[in-house]
Structure formats: structure tokens, C-alpha cells
Swiss-Prot record, chain A:
PANTHER family in the cross-refs: ABSCISIC ACID RECEPTOR PYL5 (PTHR31213:SF183), OS08G0374000 PROTEIN-RELATED (PTHR31213)
CC per GO annotation: cytoplasm; nucleus; plasma membrane
Gene: PYL5
Protein name: Abscisic acid receptor PYL5
Organism: Arabidopsis thaliana
Biological classification of the source: Eukaryota, Viridiplantae, Streptophyta, Embryophyta, Tracheophyta
Residue interval(s) of motif Latch loop: 143-145
Swiss-Prot record, chain B:
Cofactor info, note text: Binds 2 magnesium or manganese ions per subunit.
Binding locations of Zn(2+): C146, H148, C208, C210
Alphabetic keyword roster: Abscisic acid signaling pathway, Hydrolase, Magnesium, Manganese, Metal-binding, Protein phosphatase, Ubl conjugation, Zinc
Protein name: Protein phosphatase 2C 37
Catalytic activity: O-phospho-L-seryl-[protein] + H2O = L-seryl-[protein] + phosphate; O-phospho-L-threonyl-[protein] + H2O = L-threonyl-[protein] + phosphate
Job of this protein: Major negative regulator of abscisic acid (ABA) responses during seed germination and cold acclimation. Confers insensitivity to ABA. Modulates negatively the AKT2/3 activity, which mediates K(+) transport and membrane polarization during stress situations, probably by dephosphorylation. Prevents stomata closure by inactivating the S-type anion efflux channel SLAC1 and its activator SRK2E.
PANTHER family: PROTEIN PHOSPHATASE
Effect listed in the UniProt record for changing G287E: In ahg3-1; hypersensitivity to ABA during seed germination, and loss of phosphatase activity
Ligand binding (Mn(2+) 2): D142, D327, D380
Residues holding Mn(2+) 1: D142, G143, D327, D331
GO molecular function annotation: kinase binding; metal ion binding; phosphatase activity; phosphoprotein phosphatase activity; protein kinase binding; protein serine/threonine phosphatase activity
């Protein structure tokens, strides 16, 4: 059985996907993993996609190429207050603390039917308008993704498009393997980024 | 059966003898349930193609406000609440009866405890004549992600099936239904393009939540259980986890098998397609979708496919009724119980001459099954279609 994590998409340059497997750099209970290793990315991008992975945690990243300048993509990605503009699985979102522009602001998202989740409370961790970096962490909600934290970066590609890198780290829930957890989250993230590409091109 | 009835009706008439064979008694007991408003609409529905008999439409409005969901507590406060039916956007319930000599149907579709109504029901009696025989179409669609794929199935699938059946060589029902479902799936997938060009249809725009969000939602789908009933046969096509059950001489015969990702043959199919089933709050395709087949859900193709499984069943004199329902019913009510309830309602009405009574009986059955599902804490939308399959005593009509 082929695991979608090792996605054949990974080597399929035509659809712009690369799903990266974590690379161990140190031994011990906490591993530092750089998810953009082997890619040509700006230094700050590499830094943002480097995670310290504890025991019973896992991390991965999805890369999406978009044929539009980073500014156009950023206009959608920066909307911590309105992730619905490109995330199909979100039914509703409201800011419950702050205005969605400052670190520490909280949003509560309701998830569409048919998914193994109902709601999620998320905290804005990074919003770097200059370098096009956004990060949020999950602080509550009715789902199985504990201690989830994601970082999304945009940088210009050689052909005047945008490279979107979204990486995440999350606890492996009891009853599931690391591989299953990555498979599930990658499916969601990949779907979001594909939708981001379509939404950007429609603008 | 009386026990079930008592369970639903609760403590209204603890000492009253339960006459499960009397339709009048059943109707009276249904009427006692609080928060139900029966609106008899005298408006005559447009005549059906081949059926110009008197038609009457009956709408039952069921309140499903959270506070009203516990039927027992409703019953206790019945005197205060009775007849003060409340309608809100979250509680639109419709039970329709088509009064004519063919066929006799009852349907109920309620939002229940869910925030959104994503079920859709499609009833098209005499949707097709073939070899001078009347064919009837019944469908239940349970949407996920949003309502628009289920809505689209409700609007279109009977037309697609009709066109396919009209060019069907002999009785190639399986092939015809598979083709129809695939066409339906294509229409749903291509809908985005139509939208951009023509704009959405009004009904869609009004009813579809995600329309504003993104015209191209890959992550929306629907189950489809469809039955075409001819004078001789019952053809059931199923894709997803809604279900059709035949009640024959008191025995519940499932005419479809749910498409769950952990069904052994479905699991193998998914794995052979390169997908995987992950137990993530139940068995799910890639950990996401809890069914292995559906209309729509482009993002999970080719693991999740729109191809239905088709059964063709010869009708017999012992057939009593056909129940189509979404998993909002089947998750909490076993096939046998559902058949028992429907049978009791139909028996109360008796077969044959009194067409109105038989229609009411089908509506009663659909409503009672829905109430039972809500009483058993169904957390989903609940949609039920009950079709009377008993042959007339006087043999006036064969379906």
C-alpha cells in the first residue's frame, strides 16, 4: 500500500507538489527537523520550517506553486480573520480576541459536516506582512489535533510565481500512528493549498 | 410494535390501550405530540403526467429546536406547548403526501440536531413510461461539506435517469444506473464552470452556504440512494451510506449495502487505487470521509467513486413497503424496527380502496420513523421516504 504522505505527488513536478519527510538531525527525545532541506529557499523560510519535534509528535510540509505574484497570494493568506477565502473545510470563523492582526489574537472556526472535527480555537503566532509569513497554533476545539502549529511562508519563484510552503507540527493522537497522522493532515493541507492556488488565479 | 409506539409517544396516555391497528388511533397519538403543526394545504399540485386524480398536499411542520428535541420532556409539557408550533430556519420539516391512486408515498425530512440541513429528497411518481408501464422515482441524498451537491442530485438525477432509461437496450438496469450516477457526478464537478459563465441558479444561490466562499469546492459531496419502481421490479442504486430496505411479509430485506470504508471489498478497492483507510474517529478514507463512495468529493478521487451498486428485485404479492432513508435514521433505528413501524402504520390503514388513508399511513410511517430517530438522539439530518408497495385489492392499478 502506498502512503499518500510519500505522495507520488512528491516527485511530480507538474502539479507543483512536494511533500517532504522529516530528516533527523539529532538524536534524543527532541529532534530538530528542517522541512525545507534540499530546497532552494530564502534563509528565513528555512528557519520558519524548522521544528523541534518531541516524542509522540510529527511534522511535515506541503509545497504549492502558484502562477501569481506573492502579493496576490498574500492577500488571501494573511486573512487570519477570514480563512474561508480559501479553506474549503471551514464553515464559519469569528475572531474571539483581538482584531486578527496581532500576535495572540484568537479565532474560532467551525468545520463543515463530514469531517472528524467540529470546531477549533486558534491563536495567531506570526503575521509578518513584509516577509509574507503567517503562523497559528491550535489552543482548543473539538477535534483530535492537539498541539498543532503551522507556519505558511510565501516567496517568489524563479518564474515570477509564488512558492507556498506550509509546514506543521502536531501530537500523534493515541490510537494512531505517525504515518496515519501525517496522511490525514497532509490531505487537509494539500486541499487547502490547491484551493488557494485556484482562488488566487480567480482574483 | 406497541412498545415502540409507546416509547415515542411517551407518557401522554400511559393507561390508554394502544391500538396499533387503528390508523385513527395512530393519527390521534401523532397529533398529541407537541410542536407538530399539520397544515392542510388545499392547493392542488400540478397534475402528474399520467395521474390526474385528485391531489392534496399535506405539510407537517416539526419543531426541532434544541429544547424540543427530547420527546419525553415535550410530552410532559404537552399541555403548554401543544399546537404552538414554532418554525425556524433550523427546523423546516416537510412531509408530503401525494393523494392519487398511484403510488402512495410519505416523506419526512428534518434538520434535527445539525446546524445545517444538507439532506435532500426527490419524489417523482410516473416520471417515465416504458413499454406502457409507469415507472416511479424516489431518491434520498445526504450531503456533506455543504448542501449543494445533494440539492443538485435532487434537481437533476431523475431527469438523467429518465434519459438513460429511454435509450436502455433491454433491462440493463445496472449499466444504466451506473451511467446515470457518473453523469450526475460529472455535472456536479463541472458546475463551477457553468457558474462562472451563467451565474448560479437562484435556488442554489439562496440555499448554498459555500457559494459565497468559493465557487469551486472540491470538498463537497453527497450520498445517493435511488429507487426506480416498476410494476414488476424494484431497482435500487446506492452510492454512500444512505439505505433502502424492503418490508416483505414483515421481514426487513436490505436492498442496498452501505459503502463504508472498512467494508472489506471497499477497503481493498481503495487500497488498490492507492488510497488508505485511517481510523480517525471511525474508519475514513485518508482519515477524512466516513464513506467510500459518493457523488462529488473530487479531492478524494479515485479512492471515493460515484459508481452505485445496483440491485434489481422482482416484486411479489407479499411486498408491503419500501423505506429509503439517510443515516440519520439508520444510525439509530435497525432495519427490522423501521419495517415494523412502517408495517404497523400501513396495516392500520388497510390495503386498497381508501387511497387517502393509505397516503396518510405512509406519511404517518415516515413521520413516526423520524420522531423515533430524534427520540433516539440521532445527531444528523433525518430523511425518510416510505412507499406503499401493496397491490390493490381491486387490481385497478398495478403499482
Amino acid at each position: 500500500m502506498r502512503s499518500p504522505v510519500q505522495l507520488q505527488h512528491g516527485s511530480d513536478a507538474t502539479n507543483g507538489f512536494h511533500t517532504l519527510q522529516p530528516h533527523d538531525q539529532t538524536d534524543g527525545p527532541i529532534k530538530r527537523v528542517c522541512l525545507t532541506r534540499g530546497m532552494h529557499v530564502p534563509e528565513h523560510v528555512a528557519m520558519h520550517h524548522t521544528h523541534d519535534v518531541g516524542p509522540d509528535q510529527c511534522c511535515s510540509s506541503v509545497v504549492q506553486m502558484i502562477h501569481a505574484p506573492p502579493e496576490s497570494v498574500w492577500a488571501l493568506v494573511r486573512r487570519f480573520d477570514n480563512p474561508k477565502v480559501y479553506k474549503n473545510f471551514i464553515r464559519q470563523c469569528r475572531i474571539v480576541q483581538g482584531d486578527g492582526l496581532h500576535v495572540g489574537d484568537l479565532r474560532e472556526v467551525m468545520v463543515v459536516s463530514g469531517l472528524p472535527a467540529v470546531s477549533s480555537t486558534e491563536r495567531l503566532e506570526i503575521l509578518d506582512e513584509e516577509r509574507h509569513v503567517i503562523s497559528f497554533s491550535v489552543v482548543g476545539g473539538d477535534h483530535r489535533l492537539k498541539n498543532y502549529r503551522s507556519v505558511t511562508t510565501l516567496h517568489a519563484s524563479d518564474d515570477e510565481g509564488t512558492v507556498v510552503v506550509e509546514s506543521y507540527i502536531v501530537d500523534v493522537p493515541p490510537g494512531n500512528t505517525e504515518e496515519e497522522t501525517l496522511s490525514f493532515v497532509d490531505t487537509i493541507v494539500r486541499c487547502n493549498l490547491q484551493s488557494l492556488a485556484r482562488s488566487t488565479n480567480r482574483q | 410494535m406497541a412498545g415502540i409506539c409507546c416509547g415515542v409517544v411517551g407518557e401522554t396516555e400511559p393507561a390508554a390501550p394502544v391500538d396499533s391497528t387503528s390508523r385513527a388511533s395512530l393519527r390521534r397519538r401523532l397529533d398529541l405530540l407537541p410542536s407538530i403543526k399539520i397544515v392542510a394545504d388545499s392547493a392542488v399540485a400540478p397534475p402528474l403526467e399520467n395521474c390526474r386524480k385528485r391531489q392534496k398536499r399535506e405539510t407537517v411542520v416539526l419543531s426541532t429546536l434544541p429544547g424540543n428535541l427530547d420527546l419525553d420532556s415535550n410530552v410532559r409539557s404537552e399541555n403548554k406547548k401543544a399546537r404552538s408550533a414554532v418554525t425556524n430556519s433550523n427546523s423546516v420539516t416537510e412531509a408530503e403526501s401525494f393523494f392519487s391512486d398511484v403510488p402512495k408515498i410519505g416523506t419526512t425530512s428534518v434538520c434535527g440536531r445539525r446546524r445545517d440541513m444538507e439532506d435532500a429528497v426527490s419524489i417523482h411518481p410516473s416520471f417515465l413510461q416504458r413499454n406502457s408501464e409507469n415507472h416511479h422515482f424516489y431518491g434520498v441524498f445526504d450531503g456533506h461539506g455543504c448542501s449543494h451537491v445533494a440539492e443538485k442530485c435532487r434537481e437533476r438525477l431523475h431527469d438523467i435517469v429518465k434519459k438513460e432509461v429511454e435509450v436502455m437496450a433491454s433491462d440493463e438496469w445496472t449499466e444504466t444506473m451506473v451511467k446515470s450516477f457518473q453523469k450526475m457526478d460529472k455535472e456536479v464537478s463541472q458546475r463551477e464552470c457553468n457558474l462562472v459563465v451563467n451565474g448560479a441558479t437562484r435556488s442554489m444561490k439562496n440555499s448554498c452556504r459555500c457559494e459565497l466562499q468559493s465557487p469551486q469546492c472540491d470538498a463537497v459531496g453527497s450520498t445517493a440512494v435511488v429507487s426506480v419502481v416498476t410494476p414488476e421490479k424494484i431497482i435500487v442504486s446506492n452510492c454512500g451510506d444512505s439505505r433502502a430496505v424492503l418490508c416483505r411479509n414483515g421481514v426487513a430485506i436490505p436492498l442496498s449495502v452501505d459503502h463504508k470504508p472498512d467494508r472489506p471489498d471497499e477497503l481493498i478497492r481503495i487500497q488498490q487505487a492507492g488510497g488508505r483507510v485511517i481510523y480517525w474517529d471511525g474508519a475514513r478514507v485518508l482519515g477524512v470521509l466516513a464513506m467510500s463512495r459518493a457523488i462529488g468529493d473530487n479531492y478524494l478521487k479515485p479512492y471515493v467513486i460515484p459508481d452505485p451498486e445496483v440491485t434489481v428485485t422482482d416484486r411479489t404479492d407479499e411486498d408491503e413497503c419500501l423505506i429509503l432513508a439517510s443515516d440519520g435514521l439508520w444510525d439509530v433505528v435497525p432495519n427490522e424496527t423501521a419495517c415494523g413501524v412502517a408495517r404497523m402504520c400501513l396495516r392500520g390503514a388497510g390495503a386498497g380502496d381508501d387511497s387517502d388513508a393509505a397516503h396518510n399511513a405512509c406519511s404517518d410511517a415516515a413521520l413516526l420513523l423520524t420522531k423515533l430517530a430524534l427520540a433516539r438522539q440521532s445527531s444528523d439530518n433525518v430523511s425518510v421516504v416510505v412507499v406503499d408497495l401493496r397491490k390493490r385489492r381491486n387490481n385497478q392499478a398495478s403499482s
